[in-house]
A protein has these predicted regions:
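C-terminal motif of bacterial Sec signal peptides marking the signal peptidase cleavage site
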Residues: 22-25
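Extended ligand-binding regions for polar small-molecule ligands
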Residues: 27-29, 35-36, 73-85, 143-144, ...
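Extracytoplasmic small-molecule ligand-binding "clamshell" domains
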Residues: 34-116, 255, 264
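Short loop->beta-strand "edge-of-pocket" segments that line small-molecule binding or catalytic clefts
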Residues: 51-55, 150-166, 179-181
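Periplasmic-binding protein-like
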Residues: 57, 133-143, 205, 209-250, ...
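Acidic, polar ligand-binding/catalytic clefts
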Residues: 76, 80, 84, 89-153, ...
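A ligand-binding cleft/hinge motif common to bilobed small-molecule-binding domains
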Residues: 99, 116-124, 170-173, 194-226
Length: 277
């Protein structure tokens, strides 16, 4: 009888051991994780298992095309670094205007974007603290009577801005007497300004400086009329992702990544934003 009990115990132990081994083997089997099984920030930032980054060629401080025609610049560097941190491939989705970028974020056509902080845009997306600050400037013809920024907002003055740009949004709120005329994109501002005989062009200082070099008879007004805080934006509803990207932005500023990228791409007219409070 004792031998029978020992035999049953041995068989039970053997069976349990076999089951444990089977469960362990099953637990260590590897299978691809779908996006829904990823950690929360990755699932929110890359719901298609790739990071779709909006790159706006309308702002040359953030993005240009290199000699091979490929996207290059600070925003491209940041997008690729974020993709590396998340362990997902990066898809660069290119645009020619900030207004179109905002629409793409609003419609979740992209996962991250590089846009100016503005209360109007903030209604349609989540935004991080700024990573750079950019100066906005005015351009006039050499024979213009306008000499100071304070003289621009006067009756009879027509100011050309890129449709949907940060300057458009800002001046729409602030102007009292001058009239806004909207070019289709920011890079087209000076050409519209010249072709239609307007009084003032407004935009990124660096872009306008390049236009003044390209076209004769133009000058920039001294100083700046506004400072743009450039941030990263995400579609609404991705709060965990926004917290992750906000921390990423702060690290990129503190580590010198942003400053090094600006210098590598020979960008002038932009400064690394101070730490968020």
């Amino acid at each position: 009888m004792m031998r029978s009990m020992h035999a049953r115990r041995g068989a039970t132990a053997l069976l349990l051991s076999g089951l444990a081994g089977l469960l362990t083997a099953c637990g260590t089997m590897q299978s691809p994780n779908p996006p829904s099984a990823m950690p929360a920030p990755v699932a929110e930032l890359a719901p298609t298992a790739r990071l779709r980054a909006a790159i706006n060629f309308g702002n040359p401080i953030l993005a240009v095309r290199d000699a091979a025609g490929q996207p290059s610049g600070l925003s491209v560097d940041l997008a690729r670094e974020l993709g590396k941190r998340l362990g997902v491939p990066v898809e660069l989705v290119t645009f020619t205007s900030a207004g179109r970028v905002v629409e793409a974020v609003k419609n979740s056509e992209v996962d991250i974007a590089f846009v100016a902080i503005d209360p109007v845009r903030g209604a349609d997306m989540l935004q991080t603290p700024p990573y750079v600050i950019i100066e906005g400037a005015y351009l006039v013809k050499n024979d213009s009577p306008i000499r100071r920024n304070e003289e621009v907002d006067r009756p009879g003055n027509r100011i050309v801005v890129g449709n949907g740009s940060a300057y458009d949004l800002y001046l729409t709120r602030e102007l009292k007497a001058a009239k806004l005329v909207k070019a289709p994109t920011s890079p087209a501002v000076t050409d519209v300004f010249m072709a239609q005989g307007m009084e003032v062009a407004a935009g990124v200082k660096q872009q306008l400086q390049a236009d003044a070099t390209r076209l004769p008879g133009l000058r920039l007004l001294d100083g700046r009329f506004m400072v743009i805080q450039q941030a990263m934006g995400l579609p609404k509803g991705r709060e965990a992702g926004a917290r992750y990207v906000s921390a990423f932005v702060e690290e990129m500023k503190a580590s010198g990544f942003v400053d090094a990228s600006l210098k590598r791409h020979r960008v002038e007219g932009a400064l690394v934003a101070p730490p968020a409070r």
